[in-house]
């Protein structure tokens, strides 16, 4: 039996500069939906890509001394690398410079021209190059007047200066579809989400009257040329929007994917381009006599405390920085938990670090670590299949687990990601409280309570399994690691439909002997400072007055052996304000290292960190403690910061 299909798209991004956290927000949200729908059993197709034509790209390439494609290939490589880091599960990546797209754009344009929806005329209007958008005088922000006449102004979308442009252009007669579009809105009240966006489209754009749309340009030549009039380049409204069907093979020799997946179930985008997707795109599809997408969802902006992100303000957040230092799960979790989907949200370094420490490290990570440690301590790591008595709290706990699943599913269907995650964390917090209420350490002292102790452990493991499955659309590394450490290897027990009833984990399990923290705690002050520093624009390089150290030969450097290791224990050295005694794990070996970082880190804050260790130093004694290596750190103005490595690097890996 064929699966139901689900087709989801992000906007295609304009690669005129490096992507920021806002672009990652849209794409992670799409990925969360795609993963969730796959868990529900849908045949999902998830599309993202890049909008690569236009005047701004041409100017950027010329400034860089490259051809347009040379410039674009470099930019797209960075974008694809970012999506790979975030483990975005897209099924296709469309580039508007691809031949498969170009051919569809040409056919669509000529069809609309032939049937009279497009006509040739002359356009004069206010144009913003960065936005690739024309505006009427009434739409301009901060208009500039001379002798009572508008002579300039700014884009209402981005605030960039506009210029008066006059050129021959093809126009798309969208006004004739106004009544049909409004009728579609009435028949499909959930088409535009959130509802406030629908009111904005009707009141601000449709009711004042839709003006015919300029859909070609002659002032630049980087784009798809109109086949019947090659001096014209097809403008963004048709070129970019058509990607949603060109990627499926519409009007190609093979329309299998188009027939299977169209119409789209949801188009995701930021709110500044909802007008194009909720007015122009539906009208274009009507003109082509194609079904319309089922939903257009416009999420809000990620703002900073001082407004929108801007390089000049030094408040642009590079998602690569967050992923490289804190991991993809912490980054994905923050975006989906802290920012209510559909509304604007504010990014702060403080909130990012707090979410990572309190939600991920303390609540989730500590629950997993405590549970595995207790199973090792009380059952030698082997928890038998439970068949004993229940604790008086268990019925409420089991009922809450099932209610959490229902609430989670309801919120996921309405794209309330933050609320869905909140319900999971209430369940995680309640499970942590369950440990305190059942007091396994007391039960373990009474041999007559052995079966009850096994029951408590079984409920903890089952609760963790429930939470882990629900987190799979959001987190990618942590669920795999949790199932690995719990040794729950049956793939059926990783599935969403296994949560229809409580207690599916009926088999005995053998947990890992040495649980590794899933999310190491962060040093709050140090990491907030690090994120803030990373947001600043690059400083001009000045020559240092301090002489560098004597140069060494590569053979000298080659003598130093540096390996990746995980800190598994740490404590203060008695009678020392500077030293910490640290135990690290290197592949199959553990070592003790004494490090002078006590003034900058508390012992509990560094457990679980992946660090770089010099492993071939001669052993030394510091304050009576043996030290078998050196943990590398960076020093600036007397402040030491541990050099953290990505968690994906295995212990013992040689750093070169």
From Swiss-Prot:
Gene: metG
Subunit structure comment from the entry: Homodimer.
PROSITE patterns: AA_TRNA_LIGASE_I (PS00178), TRBD (PS50886)
Compartmental location: Cytoplasm
Motif ('KMSKS' region): 308-312
List of residues binding ATP: 311
Keywords: Aminoacyl-tRNA synthetase, ATP-binding, Cytoplasm, Ligase, Nucleotide-binding, Protein biosynthesis, RNA-binding, tRNA-binding
One GO CC annotation: cytoplasm
Record Pfam families: Anticodon_1 (PF08264), tRNA-synt_1g (PF09334), tRNA_bind (PF01588)
Record's protein name: Methionine--tRNA ligase
EC numbers: 6.1.1.10
Catalytic activity: tRNA(Met) + L-methionine + ATP = L-methionyl-tRNA(Met) + AMP + diphosphate
Superkingdom of origin organism: Bacteria
Residue span of motif 'HIGH' region: 13-23
InterPro entries in the record: aa-tRNA-synth_I_CS (IPR001412), Anticodon_Met (IPR041872), M/V/L/I-tRNA-synth_anticd-bd (IPR013155), Met-tRNA-synth_bsu_C (IPR004495), Met-tRNA_synth (IPR014758), Met-tRNA_synth_2 (IPR023457), Methionyl/Leucyl_tRNA_Synth (IPR015413), MetRS_core (IPR033911)
Naturally occurring in which organism (per UniProt): Staphylococcus epidermidis (strain ATCC 35984 / DSM 28319 / BCRC 17069 / CCUG 31568 / BM 3577 / RP62A)
